[in-house]
């Protein structure tokens, strides 16, 4: 599976992110605007740099600007989409089959919510996209999945309905179970569940769920 890691300009734990990249060995790395600062600090080289560069450091711009093997897309700062969205769409155009966003969380809640919204591009294109930081893994799913306890990202699994209702939600292997439940929005029912079996199943008939695996 051709994996693309996109580093964007939100909060990022350099140690975690560098280890994640080294472990995953992605076929493609993209820096979205000030995400290039992470690559510069850690002496890593992205394949692509995309953005309007309103927040990237001059040092990073100068350093990577002299490297001929990096491809650049300079965006107009007056635009309708974010640098992160442009990077995601470019990754898909380049043949990515899986996308991970690093640096997509942080103090700007508007950017975080916007980045979660962008996970839906993965559903539209049948490509899994996830947001990962040192404490969370966030995905958006339109069909059931299996979570293996030995491979889970964090102790807690939270489910948030993205559509008005997620019909027929069934949870097995969890501490708190559901059986063909119509899971509607504007409630906190799905927060902080836990896997208690070797594997847990999330199944539903219709709708879209946000799945967050979290650890303290």
Per-segment meaning from a language model:
Residues 1-63:
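N-terminal beta-strand-loop-alpha-helix module at the start
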Residues 7, 30-33, 51, 73-74, ...:
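General beta-strand structural signal in soluble alpha/beta enzymes
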Residues 106, 110-120:
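Short Gly/Thr/Asp-enriched flexible loops that form oxyanion-binding sites at enzyme active sites
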Residues 36-38, 56-58, 81, 108-109, ...:
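Short gly/pro/ser/thr-enriched loop/turn and capping motifs at secondary-structure boundaries
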Residues 121-137:
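Short, acidic/small-residue loops that bind anionic groups at enzyme active sites
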Residues 136, 141-216:
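Long, charged alpha-helical interface segments
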Residues 71-93:
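Short phosphate-binding loop-to-helix
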């Amino acid at each position: 599976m051709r994996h693309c890691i996109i580093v964007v300009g939100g909060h990022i734990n350099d140690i975690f992110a560098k280890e994640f990249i080294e472990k995953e060995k992605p076929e493609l790395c993209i820096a979205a605007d000030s995400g290039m600062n992470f690559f510069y600090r850690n002496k890593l080289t992205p394949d692509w740099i995309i953005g309007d560069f309103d927040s990237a450091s001059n040092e990073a711009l100068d350093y990577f600007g002299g490297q001929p093997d990096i491809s650049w897309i300079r965006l107009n700062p007056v635009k309708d989409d974010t640098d992160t969205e442009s990077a995601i769409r470019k990754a898909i155009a380049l043949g990515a089959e899986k996308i991970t966003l690093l640096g997509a969380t942080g103090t700007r809640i508007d950017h975080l919510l916007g980045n979660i919204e962008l996970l839906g591009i993965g559903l539209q294109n049948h490509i899994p996209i996830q947001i990962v930081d040192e404490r969370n893994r966030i995905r958006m799913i339109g069909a059931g999945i299996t979570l293996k306890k030995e491979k889970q990202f964090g102790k807690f699994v939270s489910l948030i309905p993205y559509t008005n209702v997620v019909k027929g939600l069934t949870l097995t292997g969890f501490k708190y179970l559901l059986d063909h439940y119509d899971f509607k929005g504007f409630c906190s029912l799905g927060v902080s569940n836990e896997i208690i079996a070797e594997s847990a199943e999330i199944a539903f008939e219709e709708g879209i769920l946000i799945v967050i695996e979290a650890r303290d």
